[in-house]
């Protein structure tokens, strides 16, 4: 989202200026317009950059995770707590981000490559960011449905496991009668 917003900034500026775009802006729009090779190259580079930037600076700080593991008595098997855990987490996250950022760039560039050249009058615009949002919403919906179905399976299992006898249908023990006094 950050990459596409920054790359569409020249188009947005030219829209506000009306039909009067200077020669510099016309050149920028010609080379960096959506679907152009330089646009796609910068888009991929910015996706990779923002993937690393966001992961390391916002969502997953390895020093904080290593410190939390150490404070809570947790550890990674074979890795000593503290600085070595932090180094190991940095190593693993870097390797995962190489594959993850390449995948994100591929998914975001795929619609642009598919639509270029675009037939005139084609109203369907489906960008890479839209694809990512749709896929994440579908995956989240599937996870919610699966957890709901699993909860119903557990309810059925609990109902089937209750034994008849001293317990009622709810599984609660029947109250005892007080002994008779003589």
From Swiss-Prot:
Biased composition (Basic residues): 166-182
InterPro entries: SecY/SEC61-alpha (IPR002208), SecY_dom_sf (IPR023201)
Any Pfam family hit: SecY
Regions that span the bilayer: 30-50, 92-112, 119-139
GO biological process: protein transport
Any one GO cellular component localisation term in the record: plasma membrane
Subcellular location as annotated: Cell membrane
Region spans: Disordered: 163-182
Topology versus the membrane: Multi-pass membrane protein
Lineage top rank: taxon: Bacteria
Alphabetically ordered keywords of this record: Cell membrane, Membrane, Protein transport, Translocation, Transmembrane, Transmembrane helix, Transport
Function of the molecule: The central subunit of the protein translocation channel SecYEG. Consists of two halves formed by TMs 1-5 and 6-10. These two domains form a lateral gate at the front which open onto the bilayer between TMs 2 and 7, and are clamped together by SecE at the back. The channel is closed by both a pore ring composed of hydrophobic SecY resides and a short helix (helix 2A) on the extracellular side of the membrane which forms a plug. The plug probably moves laterally to allow the channel to open. The ring and the pore may move independently.
Family: Belongs to the SecY/SEC61-alpha family.
Complex formation: Component of the Sec protein translocase complex. Heterotrimer consisting of SecY, SecE and SecG subunits. The heterotrimers can form oligomers, although 1 heterotrimer is thought to be able to translocate proteins. Interacts with the ribosome. Interacts with SecDF, and other proteins may be involved. Interacts with SecA.
Name of this protein: Protein translocase subunit SecY
Gene field: secY
